[in-house]
């Protein structure tokens, strides 16, 4: 009898949700693994830098309750990658506390492995000095200042830490920052299934049913791996996998359609095929894993200031026609009044209805009949950001631009108060590869979780 391995991906990110009916149907197929890629760098550097999640706690707890309860009651491993959204120490602890609450409320007992992804700054400094760090495309070379200024530094772990935790008997594995497919692929590879097929399956399942048609990150998907390929399926009659949808998601967030790099290897898709089978299912084969020198992607973020912003609008055709000149004159006036002579204060305008999404790359040069104006000020302190934003906003509100007819305010504000304090602003300070000779150097520990708490 042909062997297979069933991987259930309930949702694209913990907290995004999924229909209970889809999850119930998936569980009737007796999955061998429940896994979720719980985070992403897509929401930007703030969440890594601030050590905060970008998903709602209640939503994350709801999703985890289904997953942990079903996994423990049916003796199915539950593997979570990039816990808490960014996978640094505070994110891992945040997710751990939620799981402890679920165990108490659902009267569950299980062993849980915690795999931090944080990297000591001293290790990064030494690697930089030894020439063991390289920048990714379009990223400047790493500096010692960038390392020191980063609030958290994490490395994207591969499959090996997950495998080691599972080998030591963990029922639930809670990992820090991880390569997206790793949490899906670790166990099937450990059980002897082809690494290329398992990694490709994980690449698609990382976003759950987004790869189906119509796609949704808030619905379940399953990958069934065998010795020759894997089958993709959903559990919602509204969604189906197609050859096109599965192939398209394989290219998701990738610059090369044939070679997808990861920790310790490259996924070679030159011989990959997608074939529709049954009703709404797709069979994928031909994916190959090729070993490369082991490297891990480092991510770090540092604080660069504080933000204050204002949202406003105008539909005056005279103002819209001259908006670029008006903005330049307003900036000049404010800079003169505040004696701004350094680069520590940044004043930006985002003009929705003109080029708010693409900026200078916008090919359509004709503005609409109205503009949504987002004024964004970043300064060294919150107080300075507030003051500059207030002055820019009031200056633009009453600015006497060329051919102006009205003498009242130039802007319409949807909210009162108009100015919004955005708090600390972060930027990615580290987005580099570090050579790693030991793929298993992510330390982890296993704790026994019970309804009464953690047992030593």
What are these regions (language model features)?
Residues 13-15, 40-42, 83-93, 177-183, ...:
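Gly/Ser/Thr-rich loops at beta-strand to alpha-helix junctions
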Residues 294-456:
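C-terminal non-catalytic interaction/assembly regions of soluble proteins
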Residues 109-127, 353-355, 412-422:
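Short, conserved secondary-structure transition motifs
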Residues 119-175:
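An acidic, phosphate/nucleotide-engaging active-site surface
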Residues 29-46, 69, 74:
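N-terminal glycine-rich anion-binding loops that anchor highly charged ligand groups
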Residues 1-28:
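N-terminal amphipathic/basic leader segments beginning at the initiator methionine
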Residues 53, 76-87, 172-173, 372-378:
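Short glycine-rich or small-residue beta-strand-to-loop segments that form or flank ligand, phosphate
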Residues 2-10, 35, 77, 183-354:
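Small-residue-enriched flexible segments
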């Amino acid at each position: 009898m042909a062997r297979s391995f069933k991987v259930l991906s309930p949702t694209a990110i913990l907290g995004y949700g999924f229909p209970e009916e889809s999850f119930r149907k998936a569980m009737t197929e007796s999955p061998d693994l429940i896994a979720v890629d719980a985070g992403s760098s897509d929401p930007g550097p703030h969440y890594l830098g601030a050590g905060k999640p970008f998903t709602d706690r209640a939503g994350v707890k709801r999703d985890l309750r289904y997953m942990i309860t079903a996994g423990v009651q049916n003796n199915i491993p539950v593997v979570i990658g990039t816990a808490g959204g960014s996978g640094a120490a505070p994110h891992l602890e945040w997710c751990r506390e939620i799981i402890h609450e679920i165990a108490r409320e659902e009267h569950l007992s299980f062993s849980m492995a915690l795999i931090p992804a944080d990297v000591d700054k001293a290790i990064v400094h030494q690697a930089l000095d030894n020439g063991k760090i390289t920048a990714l495309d379009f990223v400047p070379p790493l500096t010692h200042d960038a390392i020191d200024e980063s609030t958290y530094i994490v490395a994207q772990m591969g499959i090996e830490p997950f495998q080691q935790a599972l080998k030591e008997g963990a029922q639930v594995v809670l990992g820090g920052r991880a390569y997206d497919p790793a949490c899906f692929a670790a166990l099937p590879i450990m059980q002897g299934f082809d690494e290329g097929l398992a990694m490709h399956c994980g690449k698609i399942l990382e976003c759950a049913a987004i790869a189906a048609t119509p796609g949704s990150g808030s619905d379940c998907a399953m990958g069934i791996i065998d010795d020759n390929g894997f089958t993709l399926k959903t559990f919602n009659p509204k969604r189906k996998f197609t050859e096109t949808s599965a192939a398209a998601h394989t290219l998701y967030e990738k610059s090369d359609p044939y070679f997808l790099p990861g920790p310790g290897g490259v996924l070679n898709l030159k011989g990959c095929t997608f074939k529709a089978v049954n009703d709404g299912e797709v069979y994928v084969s031909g994916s190959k894993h090729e070993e490369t020198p082991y490297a891990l992607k480092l991510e770090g973020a540092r604080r660069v200031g504080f933000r204050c912003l204002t949202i406003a609008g105008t539909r005056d055709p005279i103002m819209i026609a001259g908006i670029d000149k008006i903005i330049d004159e307003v900036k000049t006036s404010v800079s003169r009044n505040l004696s701004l002579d350094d680069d520590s204060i940044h004043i930006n305008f985002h003009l929705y209805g003109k080029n708010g999404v693409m900026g200078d790359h916008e090919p359509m040069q004709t503005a609409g009949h109205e503009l949504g104006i987002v004024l964004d000020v970043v300064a060294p302190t919150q107080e300075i950001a507030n003051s500059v934003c207030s002055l820019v906003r009031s200056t633009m509100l009453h600015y006497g631009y060329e051919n102006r007819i009205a003498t009242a305010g130039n802007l319409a504000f949807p909210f009162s108060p108009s100015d919004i304090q955005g708090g600390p602003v972060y930027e990615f300070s580290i987005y580099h590869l570090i050579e790693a000779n030991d793929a298993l150097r992510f330390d982890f520990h296993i704790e026994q979780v019970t309804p009464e708490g953690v047992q030593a």
